[in-house]
Swiss-Prot record:
Lineage, broadest ranks: Eukaryota, Metazoa, Chordata, Craniata, Vertebrata
Comment on bound cofactor: Binds 4 [4Fe-4S] clusters per heterotetramer. Contains two stable clusters in the N-termini of nubp1 and two labile, bridging clusters between subunits of the nubp1-nubp2 heterotetramer.
SUPFAM superfamilies: P-loop containing nucleoside triphosphate hydrolases
Residue ranges, annotated region (Disordered): 1-23
Pfam families given in the database record: ParA (PF10609)
Biased composition (Polar residues): 14-23
Name of the protein: Cytosolic Fe-S cluster assembly factor nubp1
Localization per record: Cytoplasm
Binding residues annotated for [4Fe-4S] cluster 1, in chain numbering: 12, 26, 29, 35
Keyword Transmembrane carried by entry: no
Broad class of where this protein is predominantly found: cytoplasm
Function per UniProt: Component of the cytosolic iron-sulfur (Fe/S) protein assembly (CIA) machinery. Required for maturation of extramitochondrial Fe-S proteins. The nubp1-nubp2 heterotetramer forms a Fe-S scaffold complex, mediating the de novo assembly of an Fe-S cluster and its transfer to target apoproteins.
MF term (GO), any: metal ion binding
Subunit structure of this chain's protein: Heterotetramer of 2 nubp1 and 2 nubp2 chains.
């Protein structure tokens, strides 16, 4: 990963680049000599520290999306709620959407703060077995903007993984920003030694969303990140009275199903639109317990069971996880 120091010139190639310290853009940079020496290309010691920290976490799942507004954070939150509904399981939700942290609002934790202990930062708990960490807990107001360059974001993600006292955890769900950015590279790099079970990719039925999801899939393949499957969110609207389904966002090119068939990926399921999901998120409640008999809740539960089954088989075939 090519990190760019805060005091670097505009066209800095990055400290991990082959051109580090050698590019014309490096002339006059205070970091030129150390970059040219190759010292910056040494493995980040934090990777080994995080690997040791993550030995207490059984399963690590990233939630990705090609673009914003497709329900990625909503899914991350409800996946966490669903997994934590089994009181024998310990679940943690990590929000690495540094510039757009919505998890505190969705989980009903706005105004909560992180506390320091001898073991590190203590996450905020929704339930006894559901812990949450987000940069939103470090802001004085939810309206505060986080205006950070890549290196500072990377440093915060490193701190979340290394310094948070998660304890013994069965599932760590990582809610990422939309697209492919520094945050994605950082989380994959820092967890590379600890082992990631895989990524769940969220899309909506329209081609404009699927187009960006294909980029996300290529990213996963380039960084050797396994893909658990794709979820089509906002997939039709089921009328609560007549039970007929209307396509609010028509799958003009076949939707996620055709894309998954073409790319040989599992389609984990389709979640229909339900205005009550948005209402539950605004109120910081779990839609799965608020409206458990709805078609959307049934779709969620089916998808969550597939993720449970994947993780169970993954543990059986790979003792490192």
């Amino acid at each position: 990963m090519a990190d760019v120091p805060n005091d670097a010139p505009e066209h800095c190639p990055g400290t991990s680049s082959d051109q580090a310290g050698k590019s014309s853009a490096c002339q006059g940079c205070p970091n030129q000599s150390i970059c040219a020496s190759g010292a910056t290309k040494a493995p980040d010691p934090a990777i080994e520290e995080i690997k040791q920290k993550m030995t207490s976490v059984k399963h690590k799942i990233l939630v990705l999306s090609g673009k914003g507004g497709v329900g990625k954070s909503t899914f991350s939150a409800h996946l966490s709620h669903a997994l934590a509904s089994d009181s024998s399981k310990e679940v943690a939700l990590l929000d690495v959407d540094i510039c757009g942290p919505s998890i505190p609002k969705i989980m009903g934790l706005e105004g909560e703060q992180v506390h320091q202990s001898g073991s590190g930062w203590s996450p905020v708990y929704v339930e006894d077995n559901l812990a949450v960490m987000s940069i939103g807990f470090l802001l004085s107001s939810p309206d505060d903007a986080v205006i950070w360059r890549g290196p500072k974001k990377n440093g915060m993600i490193k701190q979340f993984l290394r310094d948070v006292d998660w304890g013994e955890v069965d599932y760590l769900i990582v809610d990422t920003p939309p697209g492919t950015s520094d945050e994605h590279l950082s989380i994959v790099q820092y967890l590379s030694g600890a082992g990631i079970d895989g990524a769940v990719i969220i899309t909506t039925p329209q081609e404009v969303s699927l187009q960006d999801v294909r980029k996300e899939i290529r990213f996963c393949k380039k960084v050797n990140l396994p893909i658990l499957g794709v979820i089509e969110n906002m997939s039709g609207f089921v009328c609560p009275k007549c039970k007929n389904t209307s396509q609010i966002f028509p799958p003009t090119t076949g939707g996620a199903q055709r894309m998954c068939e073409e790319l040989n990926l599992p389609l984990l399921g389709r979640i229909p639109l339900d205005p009550r999901i948005g209402k539950s998120c605004d109120e910081g409640k779990s839609f799965l317990t608020e409206v458990p008999d709805s078609p959307a809740a049934a779709a969620y539960q089916s998808i969550v069971q597939k993720i449970r089954d994947y993780c169970a088989s993954h543990s059986a075939s790979d003792d490192s996880c």
